[in-house]
Amino acid sequence: MNKSILLAIIGISTFAYGAYTPLKAEAAQYMIKSAWNVANKTGYQVKPWNWMDSHPVIRLKSAKHNQDLIVLEGDTGNVLAFGPGRNIESEHPGRKGTTLISAHRDTHFDFLENVVIGDRFEVDSIYSQDGYQYQVSDIKIIDSDKVDIDISSSQSELKLVTCYPFNAVVAGGSLRYVVTANLVQKS
């Protein structure tokens, strides 16, 4: 009898531990979207929770790829654990220059593998009343050990960056998948 109880406790504990991470991720996304809604209405920086070292700044949507992502400020490991992040040295959407957004290849940016030239992204920012549409103009793979991602464009562009290859068994390689899109419309 004691063996059965012990096995049941181990089984329940294993299930609970396995469910904890996805539940935590769902709760985080809910809080991030709630913070975005407040920030988008007020223009103020709103943290999703008190100890978070970032705040939502951009909403990135693609109807074709069924994506509606809230982008956080900064692209540190702590930020990317919760969602896509805007590189703080890059421009805000709609301005001349590059808006650089990064995310993990196996979570928020896994859909980039299916993006093709001509696809469009809708972008909103807490720093602008305008919405923007960007159209994909280039897709390339670079080695980040040899080439830096250029963010000095003379026009308004969006770069979405993730690790490559998408199906890599080991994470942390130097290859990056870079999707570049140009501003085509303000709304």
Question: What name fits each language-model region?
Answer:
Residues 4-187:
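Solvent-exposed, non-transmembrane regions of membrane-associated and secreted proteins
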